[in-house]
Curated annotation (Swiss-Prot):
GO molecular function, one term: isomerase activity
Pathway(s): Polyketide biosynthesis
Family affiliation: Belongs to the aurE cyclase family.
One Pfam family, short name: SnoaL_2
Organism this protein belongs to: Calcarisporium arbuscula
Keyword hit for Secreted: no
Top-level taxon of the source organism: Eukaryota
Keyword Isomerase attributed: yes
Entry keywords, A to Z: Isomerase
Membrane-spanning ranges: none
Documented EC number(s): 5.-.-.-
Protein name: Cyclase aurE
Function: Cyclase; part of the gene cluster that mediates the biosynthesis of aurovertins, fungal polyketides that exhibit potent inhibition of adenosine triphosphate synthase.
Length: 136
């Protein structure tokens, strides 16, 4: 799956690529959180986790990393500028514990992210759904 980027600013794509790589690594919570402002407001509407501050966002990400195996985010498209991006993605992972341990879950979503002058995420809204279709 190729990524389309409708933004001529390569720095925006590079910033997003680094963030996606940190999420895909799923082991270094400090690295992931280094992309967020201490004043972040983070919401993941699919899981009804809304208006989280920095500490709550960190806890949320850490729990996610510990609840799944083989987390992989694939960028589908990206548009935006230094202040705002809209990123479409596909995520796959395996559940570690539930009645469906090992089940591969596919999700498709969009992240809307706003950035401060330092390039840190100050607001992020994730919208996603479980996806049973092809990833491509």
């Amino acid at each position: 799956m190729s990524t389309s980027c409708s933004n001529p600013d390569d720095q925006v794509k590079a910033r997003n690529d680094k963030f996606m790589a940190a999420l895909n690594d799923a082991t270094d919570i400090d690295l992931v959180m280094s992309f967020f402002s201490p004043d972040v407001s983070y919401s993941d509407f699919a899981f009804e986790a809304v208006n989280m501050d920095f500490t709550s966002t960190r806890d949320y990400m850490d729990k996610m990393f510990h609840a799944v195996d083989d987390l992989h985010l694939t960028q589908v498209s990206l548009t935006g500028d230094k202040d705002f991006t809209a990123s479409e993605w596909v995520m796959t992972y395996k559940l570690k514990s539930s009645d469906k341990v090992g089940e591969v879950v596919k999700m498709r979503g969009v992240s809307l992210s706003w950035y401060d002058a330092q390039g840190l995420i100050v607001r992020n809204n994730d919208y996603s759904l479980k996806w049973s279709g092809d990833i491509d």
